[in-house]
Amino acid sequence: MKTGLIVFAREPLPGAVKTRLAASIGDQAAADQYETMLEDVLKAVRQLDDVAPVVYWACEEGSLPRLSEKYRCRSRRQSWGDLGQRMRVAFEEMFADGTDVCCIIGSDAPDLPLLYIQEAYRLLGALQTDAVFGPSRDGGYYLLGLRQVWP
């Protein structure tokens, strides 16, 4: 079974990330904090067996080679649209590349236990669950896992 992991990220530019945090600590400090979280997330997910994470960047097209090299990761550019549309396109691309099950996480949850991601893959694979959500306290979710994209 080919497992995919999408990490949604933004280029850590001052004024472009963690804007609510930046209001109290400044644009550069917020960008530095975001970059630290991103690096921690990437370091963690590289420990997953048989999973090659792909970072989907919200960035200019010309930034992809530099970001791929700097963060040593497979990189793609996020599509346009709202978050749901961008996630859908990312899943579609991963499944088109032969991925059997795929999860998506954000780049600002460095304390997300790898066990949670592994459990999502177990549910999607062995138990053939169609979709898995990792609910967060704020009413959103920290992980979405799918076996396929539905129309």
Predicted regions and their residues:
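Conserved donor-nucleotide/metal-binding helix-loop-beta segment in metal-dependent transferases, i.e.
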Residues: 110-140
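Short acidic/His/Gly/Ser-rich catalytic and metal-binding motifs that mark active-site loops
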Residues: 13-19, 63-66, 141-143
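Short aromatic-hydrophobic micro-motifs that form the base-stacking/packing surface
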Residues: 103-105
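Short phosphate-binding loop-to-helix
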Residues: 68-101
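A short, N-terminal amphipathic alpha-helix
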Residues: 32-51
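Short, high-confidence coil segments that cap the C-terminus of an alpha-helix
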Residues: 50, 99-100, 128-129
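Short beta-strand/loop segment that forms part of the nucleotide-sugar
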Residues: 50-59
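N-terminal nucleotide-binding beta1-loop-alpha1 segment
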Residues: 1-21
